[in-house]
């Protein structure tokens, strides 16, 4: 995972929101970023020299708050030297399929366009 993070140009964090947070499985994988945190704040080194852009995609079955999950995902992107280009949050997926949400589909297209044109 770490070698991919260092090589890629863009990173998209995608997760369902459970109990107002990204999934435990995503957090378990991303806990490997502790090495980046230590490099930056303890050893005073740049852990991922290649700057990149990123984005966050969050889904939720209900209409609960998204702030905690979004904050966690944004913090993880920063640890990977990503400048976030935005978040797409889709809620009520238990009631309305994403394919029926033209507003969300447009937000995703807009975010994809920003990723495509980012340097």
Task: Identify the role of each PLM range.
Residues 1-78:
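Helix-loop-strand module that forms the ligand-binding subsite of alpha/beta enzymes
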Residues 74-119:
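Glycine-rich phosphate/pyrophosphate-binding loop and the adjoining helix
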């Amino acid at each position: 995972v770490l070698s991919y993070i260092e090589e890629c140009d863009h990173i998209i964090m995608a997760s369902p929101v459970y109990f107002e947070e990204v999934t435990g499985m995503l957090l378990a994988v991303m806990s490997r970023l502790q090495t980046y945190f230590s490099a930056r704040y303890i050893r005073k080194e740049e852990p991922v020299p290649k700057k990149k852009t990123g984005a966050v995609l969050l889904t939720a079955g209900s209409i609960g708050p998204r702030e905690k999950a979004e904050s966690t995902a944004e913090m993880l992107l920063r640890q990977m030297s990503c400048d976030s280009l935005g978040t797409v949050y889709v809620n009520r997926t238990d009631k309305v399929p994403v394919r029926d949400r033209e507003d969300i589909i447009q937000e995703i297209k807009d975010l994809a366009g920003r990723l495509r044109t980012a340097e």
